[in-house]
Amino acid sequence: MHNRVRTCVSACFYYSGLVSLVHWWMQHSERHLIILCYHRAAGGNLRSHLFYLRRHFRILPLETALEELYMSHKKGVQMEDRRTLLALTFDDGYYDNYTHAFTLACELQVPITIFLIPGYMKSSNSFWWVETDHLVSHAQVDEVAIDGRTYHLERPEERNALAGTIDARVRCAPSVAEREKFLALVREALAVPPSGAPEEAALPLKWAEVRAMEESGWVSFGAHTTHHPDLEYLVDPAEVQREVGECRTMLEQQLGHPVRTFAYPHGSIGDEGLCAVQQADYNWAVTIAPGFNTRRSDPYLLRRRVVDIKQHWLLVATGIAGIWLFFSRLKRFTGLLMRKLLHLTSIVGK
């Protein structure tokens, strides 16, 4: 119901011309680059998203778009196509990026960039967050004790609580080794059989699929660490350096050319993460902080807007335009202003 209401309101914003007004402003002010962040590609409205985006934006490969953003002003280049620059990115490298996103990219002639996690690609393991869901849903016990709490798994709310506990422990692990050790202990405690892998679409890409996509000319690739840890929680700076630097080395060995872009896992950075990206000699790094990028943007803290493929394209249109973010901030400002006024009124009343 909530999504339907938001879609209807988005339709009002769109067909009233408000979204077009934002587009006009971006086209007639300094050059902007919008970077979108997808993850999965199957089971949603990706096709309708791409139809809308292709019509209203000038979509370029991420590296090409960044080069134009930072260099066009210095060269004094005037572009005939004044549409706002946009780059499409997919994090993690799910198999459905190959079966769905790649297919649509070729069909609609829309370039995309996929950020890969090579540590998973060379094994048959699923991503750790997929593994977390799989463990809880395939538990063979009715009761388990994790981190000093007992969970009664016949109750859905207890299963959800356990999934949240596991996810938090794994996400905030101080090292990749500790993360994998904890997952192994949970698998044993839940008596989950080794067979029964997640759906194929949720598995990592293989190198053969990556090469096939790159050869098409419509897909490029960036780095997303070797094992997808949260860089901010890793306690050893040397491990942060390895996750960031070795990822680039592995990708370049497989692809045969430089890899210049990096995406922070979870959008989480930390001082060590930022330093590691700079020392690994990447040209650019993207976060998941929403907003636009200009030539004044920090090349290692580029903004990206996370998009859910299940969203209606109208929600995507208003989201990219920043309309919902504007009203959210206006609501917070209004609430703060009202509290201030009430406080002043109470003082005057005394």
Region locations from a protein language model:
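C-terminal active-site subregion of NodB/CE4 polysaccharide deacetylases
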Residues: 1-88, 96, 127-136, 141-144, ...
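CE4/NodB-like, metal-dependent polysaccharide N-deacetylase domain
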Residues: 79-82, 94, 103-115, 168-195, ...
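Acidic/aromatic-lined carbohydrate-recognition and catalytic surfaces
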Residues: 84-147, 153
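Short, catalytically relevant binding-site loops at active-site mouths
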Residues: 121, 227-229
